[in-house]
Amino acid sequence: MKGRLLDAVPLSSLTGVGAALSNKLAKINLHTVQDLLLHLPLRYEDRTHLYPIGELLPGVYATVEGEVLNCNISFGGRRMMTCQISDGSGILTMRFFNFSAAMKNSLATGRRGLAYGEAKRGKYGAEMIHPEYRVQGDLSTPELQETLTPVYPTTEGVKQATLRKLTDQALDLLDTCAIEELLPPELSQGMMTLPEALRTLHRPPPTLQLSDLESGQHPAQRRLILEELLAHNLSMLALRAGAQRFHAQPLSANDALKNKLLAALPFKPTGAQARVVAEIERDMALDVPMMRLVQGDVGSGKTLVAALAALRAIAHGKQVALMAPTELLAEQHANNFRNWFAPLGIEVGWLAGKQKGKARLSQQEAIASGQVQMIVGTHAIFQEQVQFNGLALVIIDEQHRFGVHQRLALWEKGQQQGFHPHQLIMTATPIPRTLAMTAYADLDTSVIDELPPGRTPVTTVAIPDTRRTDIIDRVRHACITEGRQAYWVCTLIEESELLEAQAAEATWEELKLALPELNVGLVHGRMKPAEKQAVMASFKQGELHLLVATTVIEVGVDVPNASLMIIENPERLGLAQLHQLRGRVGRGAVASHCVLLYKTPLSNTAQIRLQVLRDSNDGFVIAQKDLEIRGPGELLGTRQTGNAEFKVADLLRDQAMIPEVQRLARHIHERYPQQAKALIERWMPETERYSNA
């Protein structure tokens, strides 16, 4: 095996790795020895020195050594083995709920043992529940660990001990095999070598400060963080370079339709809308496909920006497709576009999963013939049987629901006669700048950072659930006395549509009883699309006073007369999602209110989060706070990019490095294309498929 590169050495060549273990390791993307070496510890335990039992404090993880005083099995409410050991400074009780006869026999009175675990304060002094322990024999010197003990991310059926043993073998192989140094010499100067960094992180010497590792500041970590962030940025540059190789139809200035629409509008676009439209039009005039992300806060007028971009393509006799994540939102877009485009003689088509038979067929024919110039729908518009006629622009609404993979698939679908469509992605979920720079480095970004005049900021209050009857009275007052409409949003922590629907139904029944004079509607994710549409339509037309809903109404529903929203259990949702929900009110000129109806007691984090919402109506401020409180993985969600999860890097902790990383990534991309490709393959093997799309 000498001299081989470790990315070519399969894990099956290690002692103890058979087919069953290979399959389990594959679940956490471990296939080669290099993969294993890059599978870094989540945290470390210090088992290198002994703690006197008498000095143990609750919450401290420690190794203790002592003589077994007694070991008993009790059969109270639950079968349990308790064992007491003493080191002269104090007595520790160890409790085990899963144990065997062999374990009990090994802990015979008079034996000496080592135990490692979290100290707790028990009825009779210090105790540990299910500590790891090892019997020492009678007089032997305790065998302590020589390095800090790593704790790895794992999967069902793969124990920490197994990963540690396999990693020991992998580290031994570093002496005979090579792991390729991929950083150019001018970057790696003065840094730890890769083998050095890996040895340090897998087996840190006891002299190393745990606090350095916990803060991510150790030179070994910085070496790998730099490499991982570079790989991430290089993958985005590769996607981008791939896009630049393609041709798009250049759509030069042709403003006749645009000017007609602007003249017919009862308002003037904001400065921010005009600026973003100009950025889009500049991109569309080029012969490479536009790839632009438009971020706009709730209610900032992204739909008008999309309409003006669409008119540029339609003026050239081309087609435009707009894809939204839900039928509800797609239908609303279709209605908006019809209102704007019908007077201009432009036909708007609509395609969704629920359309069947003749209706669907005739819509497909109208698209294929070019009779329909603007097509709005869900992902159904990109199914095989839909044929476009000169598709030049694809607009995707709500990027969070579509990953990078769908983004590329959709692009391929639109390719005709060697031309790729321009692509515009719109999101109402503001993304903090550092995250946007990393997760969307393959896109140009525009921000609509101004709300249209006449929008009233929503006043937000947090009220405990114990005052529920007061809130119900407030709903009655808003709907009857003030003639307004209200939302009551039910949330559940489980990602279960069924449980969420049941909770909403129970609340609906409760509110119908409490408010007999109101018409109360219900909408949730388990209802058929047609039922949902019917309820939403009657709410929009003012036939319902109060709408009980699950978080399905998070995006895009526009009812200007709704001025009050109650959100139950807001502590269960992220800030960005709460801000999205709150954006359903405050869409008219009247003062609007949002009540966060929380369950007591609230944790510290929940209190901080609800305070952020009370203090700010700015989606970008809220997104930055959400990032600080929850971290980047949750905010971006792997559902969305498939790559928010990093092995060593942490976008929040390492955000100061990102501008420099981007500069270095461009340098490697231009000067060292082979290393760039190898870095992407090392850290992001999944992405490599897409950068060749």
Positions of the model-derived regions?
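C-terminal accessory region of SF2 helicases/translocases
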Residues: 601-693
